[in-house]
Amino acid sequence: MHNYAKARQLRRTMSLPEVLLWQELRNVDLKFRRQHPVGPFVLDFYCAAAKVGVEVDGIAHEMGEQPHKDEVRDGWLRQRGIRIVRVPAVEVLRSASDVAASIVALCRR
């Protein structure tokens, strides 16, 4: 079951790193979707043509049970043929254009 309502809400409340990366990804010749629902999950960004999902990870992804939850989620997505790229939020803040270029290069492989 897709979580469209959650995706809509997340589009309205994107974090600063997500906004910065979206500004870069929306200007490339590949189509990216932001806050895209896939089954029970919502990907920060998704390139359907390349089947690549992008997650911008803040510090919370390193704490408590979150790393395990991320592994389970990534495994579920991989089983459906979606490659997952996890990008630290601090890297996006440092250079959103460099991060976007790396993602685009991966999508073109």
Question: Can you annotate each of these PLM segments?
Answer:
Residues 10-14, 38-107:
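Basic, amphipathic alpha-helical patches used to engage nucleic acids or provide basic targeting signals
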Residues 1-33, 79, 101, 109:
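Solvent-exposed, charged helical/coil patches
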